[in-house]
Amino acid sequence: MFDEKTYIEREGKLKDGYIRAAAMTPKIKVADCEYNIENIKSLMSEAHKKDTAIAVFPEMCITGYTCNDLFLHDRLLNAAIQGLVDIKKYSETTPGMISFVGLPYEMNGKLYNVVAGIMNGCILGMVPKMYLPNYGEFYERRQFTPGFNECVYVDVDGEEVPFGSELLFTFNNNRKVKIGVEICEDLWTPQPPSIKHAMNGATIIVNASASNETIGKDTYRKQLVSGQSARLVCGYVYSSAGGGESTQDIVFSAHNLICENGSTLAEAHKFADESVYADIDVERICSERRRMSTYAVDENSTYTEVQAQNFINKELELIRYFDKAPFVPSDKKERDSRCEEILNIQSYGLKKRLEHTNCKNAVIGISGGLDSTLALLVTVRAFDLCGFDRSGIHCITMPCFGTTDRTYNNAVKLTKQLGCSLREINIMNAVRQHFEDIGHDENNHNVTYENGQACLLYTSPSPRDC
């Protein structure tokens, strides 16, 4: 039996605000619950060994999504509940990890498409699918009833379990981690439940899905998941059905995704039925939401928070990739587009200022380095946009101790090729006089030495002096 006290004692703090999530697709056979359960348990064990805190499985993974009218048979429904109980008991062997699994569930004579959250030997809650597709290749309303928001309690294996869409799964050891659930089609609607989840505090959305493949749908799906994570400023874990489903009408590719605030952290290869893992930065999510003054929490919340026990909270070796140059795209075409955008933003800003002040002259200190070169290029484009003569751009080069032939020559050549005015002011004697005034040895190359040159470099002539 799970010993919470022992578990808490061996756990540390959430390492740097990250929590590990997995989107998993088990091998299944349609309507073979026993076979499916064994494969789900196997993946749960695999995820737990990798210190995963959140494991998400596909829609209807206990029975298979493509059971069609078999969903109306008691034998399959009872097998699904027995499978859920089996997973609940097995979760005692994966302490600290919450697993989300999909199954059909009958209540008051109605059949619901639900996802159950399971952890440490308990069924924490069950969330029904709100939007049932009944168009094209889908006809879920033939068997299922749309879910509802209100939280009610249902009996599962002698355990009172909260049931409803407005559930958030929270944890004892970190209140910043709040999980909301939506199911497949819910995300594709004009007003997904995840919007309300996030406005009521959810920092991570999990989606148990059975999304089929058509030409181009994978690209749209990825944009949808990534875009929703950006719009809601959240982590989004999306698990989809795979090759074990029936292909009578549709084909599934197990296109599993994990996104965070608009970035794709992990993506499965289609048709590989593979699991993907990622470390979600919950601290960053909370920080971004604090920064956004328009991100308001619903004050009239009717949500029920399901209190879970402590999740896996070790100091982990991050599996997340960090780009050494996060603001510089690696793709040349995208990089060129980004540079053009930067140049336009700065140039049009300067153009407005020049026109507003009726100024046709600009003075720029040119060192031959990156900063002054960019400033010159921006000014040149702004002058071109205004229709001004480039000779009104007065480039001043001020050589001193630190000036090399390379940077000096770069500054001179760049200015001449762009058709700007050039003036050279050697500040070496002025800097020496400054050092003499303050009693500093020019051979002592410390901060004072650097600042002495910098002070005079910022003393540029005005346009009228040029």
Predicted feature locations:
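Hydrophobic alpha-helix-in-membranes signature
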Residues: 57-58, 398, 462
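A conserved beta-strand->alpha-helix junction
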Residues: 275-277, 307-323, 388-450
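A glycine-rich phosphate-binding loop feature that marks nucleotide/adenosyl-phosphate handling sites
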Residues: 360-372, 430-431
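Short glycine/threonine-rich loop-to-helix capping motif typified by GTGT followed
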Residues: 366-379, 407-410, 438
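Single conserved hydrophobic/aromatic residue that forms the stacking wall/gate
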Residues: 458, 463-466
